[in-house]
Amino acid sequence: MGSRLHVQEIKKGPPLPFKDDIRAFTREYAESLDAQDPLRHFRDEFIIPSKKDLKRKTLNANENIEDSSDPRSIYLCGNSLGLQPRNTRKYLEHYLRTWAIKGVTGHFTPHDDQLLPPFVDVDDAGAKLMAPIVGALESEVAVMGTLTANLHFLMASFYQPTKEKYKIILEGKAFPSDHYAVESQIQHHNLDPKDAMVLIELENLDRPILDTEKILRVIDEHASSTALILLSGIQFYTGQYFDIEKITAYAHSKGIIIGWDCAHAAGNVELKLHDWNVDFAAWCNYKYLNSGPGGMAGLFVHENHGRVDMTKVGSKDEPFRPRLSGWWGDDKKTRFRMENRFVPQPGAAGFQLSNPSVLDMNAVAASLEIFNRTSMAEIRKKSLDLTGYLEHLLLKYPLDAAPEDKPFSIITPSNPAERGAQLSLRLGPGLLDNVLEVLEENGVVIDERKPDVIRVAPAPLYNTYADVWQFCQIFFDACQKAVRARK
């Protein structure tokens, strides 16, 4: 009788943590979490595609795309492409207006109602907005280029192979573009990737996780011949969040430079690139940072590597780190003198080449401005709860099934500290296509990695607990239908 009364009291009271509340599997519980969410107002800052939008065959540019009677989609794909902030249009219109009424003088003419400074200084504004998101000094960040191009620029500076130290260590299952970039850098130095490219391979394909100790063992094995390590902050396929601080410190203890591809980490987890003494990093801004498809990327160069010794300029001693140079990295005070004597700006700005696309910078800034209204600590706190709730619902389905009988398994680490927003679900053989069909029919947007994985990533700025709950109901139904179809 006592336990029954206890259950009744729980049902009447405020929501408890989802692991302790029997109501966690109800829509009402999810909505109660949304009502208590201190970041809930940020959802209104983004345009959520409707279910009708996803099925439309024409753009109909003059049509209202935000009909309140048209249900919104369940968009859990911020790990692939973030949604459009509402203020992106305003930022772009300000840019177009400036270009229209000022032409080339827009490079230097400030306006009382400007959202960004004149064209010549927009890169500084981008760095200021980006720095707190990746835990960097403003001088250590540049918003520029694209991810793989930036990795090439950085490796051109940081990969300086010698006869003794010439190897690059990276994941065996790194994102293909990273693999290609490393391979081509090695070939560019007339080295053989078969000898100079060290891949950290998985020990168990059924558990596609790279333990930190495994990574450290590989570093130990090749320390005397390794010139550079390049790893992902968060692994794109599994969603595993690597221990950046520990691995970086270990690499440095062996005298090895280490860089990080933070494409799936920037805007997702709380990075501290400066405090962790990361040598360099690069990332794209179109995933969790919502800058639009192929939007301008970012890079980080620790202040230890960005110094310019003005007392040595013009001497035989190298006053700054070697790099591929361009005029936009030149000292601002002398840039427009066209003297053909390169002296870089200190910090990451000195790694810039061409002047940035002001159009793209406005799209990046529109989203970063929203991030700067809160903090990555607060965003990460909600993300842990949101993805934890998703995991809780997934693990309880179906309640009466043994693990080997479930239609899916979660291949992302179960420790919340070892993952970001994303959970990667591996479906049973032959289920993927049918599951995707049901999800699409019901306005659910996720992405897949064939032959059997879907990636689900609730973005804390615009996704809700109700989104997560509703996704799970549709996903469970999709699994049931796919299992029946397979039989």
Curated annotation (Swiss-Prot):
Per UniProt, the enzyme's principal EC class comes to hydrolase
- What does it do? Catalyzes the cleavage of L-kynurenine (L-Kyn) and L-3-hydroxykynurenine (L-3OHKyn) into anthranilic acid (AA) and 3-hydroxyanthranilic acid (3-OHAA), respectively.
Which is a Gene Ontology cellular component entry for this protein?
cytoplasm
UniProt catalytic activity:
L-kynurenine + H2O = anthranilate + L-alanine + H(+); 3-hydroxy-L-kynurenine + H2O = 3-hydroxyanthranilate + L-alanine + H(+)
Enzyme Commission number(s) from the entry: 3.7.1.3
Q: What name goes with this protein?
A: Kynureninase 1
Q: Where does pyridoxal 5'-phosphate bind?
A: 147-148, 175-178, 232, 261, 264, 286, 327, 355
| Keywords in alphabetical order | Cytoplasm, Hydrolase, Pyridine nucleotide biosynthesis, Pyridoxal phosphate
